[in-house]
UniProtKB/Swiss-Prot annotation:
Keyword RNA-binding: yes
Family annotation (CDD domains): S1_IF1
Known role: One of the essential components for the initiation of protein synthesis. Stabilizes the binding of IF-2 and IF-3 on the 30S subunit to which N-formylmethionyl-tRNA(fMet) subsequently binds. Helps modulate mRNA selection, yielding the 30S pre-initiation complex (PIC). Upon addition of the 50S ribosomal subunit IF-1, IF-2 and IF-3 are released leaving the mature 70S translation initiation complex.
Subcellular localization(s) per the UniProt record: Cytoplasm
PANTHER family hit by this protein: TRANSLATION INITIATION FACTOR IF-1, CHLOROPLASTIC
Domain S1-like, chain residue ranges per copy: 1-73
Full protein name: Translation initiation factor IF-1
UniProt keyword terms in alphabetical order: Cytoplasm, Initiation factor, Protein biosynthesis, RNA-binding, rRNA-binding
TM helices/strands, residue ranges: none
Length: 73
């Protein structure tokens, strides 16, 4: 399991909604990633729409997948 030091925190925008609470996110650096909601966002019933600005955490070992940890207002 990745340690907290191994995560990369970036910001991006939701570009596409995928089945199973997955999303296509376009990061600020132009890189597209596939992301899912973190557990606390699922439990709080926080929904994302296309165009929402989000903060994602990525593992340093797989830069194609991410976890959405915050939706900006």
């Amino acid at each position: 399991m990745a340690k907290k030091e191994d995560t990369i925190v970036l910001e991006g925008r939701v570009k596409e909604l995928l089945p199973g609470m997955h999303f296509k996110i376009l990061l600020e650096n132009g890189m597209p990633v596939t992301a899912h909601l973190c557990g606390k966002m699922r439990m709080s019933n926080i929904r994302l729409l296309v165009g929402d600005r989000v903060t994602v955490e990525m593992s340093a070992y797989d830069l194609t997948k991410a976890r959405v940890v915050y939706r900006h207002r």
